[in-house]
Regions:
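Conserved Walker A/P-loop ATP-binding site and its immediately adjacent core
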Residues: 1-29, 101
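Conserved nucleotide-binding/hydrolysis micro-motifs of P-loop NTPases
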Residues: 8-11, 69-72, 95-96, 120-124, ...
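Alpha-helical scaffold elements adjacent to nucleotide-binding pockets in ATP/GTP-utilizing enzyme cores
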Residues: 13-21, 85, 89, 101-105, ...
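Inter-Walker segment of RecA-like/P-loop motor cores
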Residues: 23-73
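Conserved acidic residues
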Residues: 62, 87, 112, 132-134
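SF2 helicase catalytic motif II
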Residues: 68-70, 79-116, 121
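Short regulatory helix/loop adjacent to the ATP-binding pocket of P-loop NTPases
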Residues: 123-135
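Conserved interdomain linker/interface between the two RecA-like ATPase lobes of SF2 helicase motors
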Residues: 133-167
Length: 167
């Protein structure tokens, strides 16, 4: 299984959540036993030099998390070798998938089950994201359930140079 994210920060956040099983491991929910084995999560933080190196890395992991910039910079044969090691591909921030770099990578995984996540299901350029919507959490429902709080904006940068040393 591979998870592709757009940034290093998300790669770190997602890999930590997967490694710890996130909310699944919260004892108050009783979803899994404390003794359950946790997945071996690999963080692909550099480009493998060959398909063999990529495969060797993938074989040591249950889940690999990487960024689009890393996997997108690999040659097609290495991408396909990685895809052949994956039962599933999870794409975070999937509204980016119509972009050329993302669609090339996604094409390498065409024989893999792909699950895409996005909170931005519409693009300004009207390019379709593709796929079938299997879950939708409307903004109105999120607002009604209190997931949005009032924003108290405090600027970090003062544009008026006479006030730049004051808060």
């Amino acid at each position: 299984t591979m998870i592709i994210v757009p940034t290093d920060a998300l790669r770190t956040q997602i890999s930590n959540k997967v490694a710890s099983l996130g909310l699944l491991s919260n004892s108050q929910f009783g979803l899994i036993k404390e003794t359950v084995l946790k997945p071996i999560v690999g963080v692909m933080s550099h480009r493998p030099c060959s398909a063999e190196e990529a495969i060797a890395f993938m074989e040591q992991c249950n889940v690999v998390v990487t960024t689009i910039s890393i996997i997108g910079s690999l040659s097609k044969p290495i991408q396909v070798a990685i895809a052949n090691q994956c039962s599933h591909l999870f794409v975070d921030e999937a509204h980016h998938t119509p972009a050329r770099s993302w669609s090339i990578v996604k094409d390498s995984f065409k024989n893999t089950k792909i699950l895409q996540f996005t909170a931005t299901p519409f693009r300004n350029d009207d390019k379709p994201i593709g796929g079938k919507i299997i879950f939708n959490y409307p903004l109105r429902k999120a607002q009604d359930e209190g997931y949005f709080k009032p924003i108290n904006y405090i600027p970090i940068i003062e544009w008026n140079s006479k006030q730049s040393d004051q808060i």
